[in-house]
Each structure stands twice: as C-alpha cells, then as structure tokens.
Amino acid sequence: MAMLKYGGNAGRGGHQLTERTSEQVFAAREEAAAFFGGKPENTIFCLNCTHALNLAIQGIVQPNDHVIISNLEHNAVLRPVAAMVRERGVQCSIAPVSVDDKETIAAFRARIRPNTRAMICTLASNVTGQILPYRELAALCNEHDICMIADGAQACGTLPVQMSDGINILCTAGHKGLYGATGTGLLITDTKFPIKPLLYGGTGSLSAQVNQPEILPDKFESGTHNLLGIAGLNEGIKYVMNKSPQKI
C-alpha cells in the first residue's frame, strides 16, 4: 500500500503520485525537525547513521585538523576518523570516558589543541549503555569554537536529545529508538560549521547548473530518496511523540 501511495520520485515530476510523495517527504522532514528542535531545511535524510556521520566528519574535518573522540566510539566514527588520519594527515586524540562525568569532561578538555576542529562522540555507548555528559561537552566545544558532532544512534528516541543542548551536528539512525525502517538516518545541523557534500548529483532542483546547489537540504541529498523508509520514519517519530513522551 505504501508503494502505491508514495511510489513517486519526490521533486522529479508534477503528476499526482510524485506530488503526494514530495508532500510526504516534506512532512517527515518537519516532524523530525520538530522532534529534535532543529529547522526543517537543516534536517537531512541519510541512508543510516553511518552515512550521516561520514557526511559530518568528512564534510567538516580538513587536512591537518585535530579531532577528539571518546574511547567508546562505534566503528561508524572510529573508521572514518582513522581513514582521515591515514590519508589526510588529520590528528586524533582519544579521551577516556569515566563513570565520573567530571573526569570525562576534564579528559576531553585536556586534549583540546589550537587546531582542534571537531569533537565527535557518542551520546550513549552501544556496548555498555553509558550516557556521556554530552550537554557539558557541547558547552566545552562552544567555549573553544569546536564543532560538536554527536552520534545519537543509541540515544535518540530514548533520551531527550535536542539541538538546543548545544550540538552542532546531530547524526542518528532511523531504525532504533525512532521506530523507523532500516536504511534510514538523519543529520541535523545548526549550520554554524559549513559542511562539504559527500555525494554530488541530481537533486531535482537547479538542474540546469553544473555545480551542486548550495541550498539546504538539497546540497546533501543527491539521488533518489528512500521514500518508503522516510514515510515509515515519519510514522515512527509520531509514535514516539504520541505514545512515549514521558520516557524521553
């Protein structure tokens, strides 16, 4: 039924099916933005959290920049960072996470350098479930003009994660705490730190120009969306909003 209702290609036509599908994508974007306290145009649909994290990390960090990660990171963070260390001369420090939040914050603070570009950390560990003091870490980043990239895969939909917590770029999966389908993810940015696209191609907008559009979300959404997955993610977020707000 979803295929019959939302089987058009959003932004690529003017017939009824495509228009209905485009409206569904817009509605899902608004729902996700409202849930996390972001802006719809700054809410980017991705293939999964790994895709979102790669977009953020590779789009923000430049050669010879320094980044800080925690010792609890998923390979979705560790491997992109390791590749940039190996191939682009990026420097990386690993901050140990303690059961004492003050010690964790001190460990991150001690590793800040003049060329620190980003702090990339999970909000909650996928192994132990430990919740990092992400609001305090975000404040630390803001104090030093460092981009806070948050891996929210294990936290979003379970913890009350908001862009107002000081996160600059929030990356998350659709299929975990948001009850969406696999093959969906989100990146939400406050646009303080410009991101370079990871993919280039058709966006259904400004098709006569050879350069990638600068407007968001088009800049980061080349190619056909996972339209059925986005429709499911929209319903999942509505479920969390309507059925379990007291849990988050």
Model-predicted regions and their roles:
Residues 1-248:
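Pyridoxal 5′-phosphate
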